[in-house]
Amino acid sequence: SANKQIATVTNSGKVIGKKEGNTKVTVKLTNGKKLICNVSVKSNKYSGKKLTISDTTYNQYGLKVYSAYFDNKGNLVVKFMVANNSYGKLTKIPKLKITVKDSKKNVVASFKKNSYTINVNSYKSKSYTISIPKSSLKKSKDKIDVRTCTFTISGKDADATL
C-alpha cells in the first residue's frame, strides 16, 4: 500500500481499510508484472434526509432516522427526527422501536423503549440520539455496513399536551 495509514494488505492479500481516504495498492505477480489498484476507503456511516414539517401529514407526527454510525466503543449511534405537524406539544412516544436490517434483510440491531420522553412544540421538529450498545448487536461492528442498512422507526400515538 502506498499509504499504510489509509489501507494495508495482509500476507494473504486481503486489503484492510484503516481510515477514510484514497491510496494505491501495488501487486507484484509471480511473472514479475506489477498491477496498481486505486483503493478508496469510506467511513461506515449512514446519512439520509432530515424529516421536516412539510414531509409530515397535517395533524400527525413523523419519525425518521437520518444518521447512524459506530462510536469509538463500538456502540451504534442512531440519530432521528421527530416532526410535530399538529397543535399541542409532544411529550413522549409510547413503544418506540428502531430496527436496523442489513442488505440481506437480516436484523442486525434493534432498540425498544416502552416510553421515550421527548419535547417537541407544535409545528416544530427536533433531533434525538439513541445509542444501541455493542452487546445488543447481532453481528460485530466490522461485519455491519451501516451505509447499506435500512432503518425502520415506529411508535404508538405520541402523547401530546394541549
Question: Model-flagged regions — what are they?
Answer:
Residues 10-11, 61-67, 111-116:
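Short structured motifs
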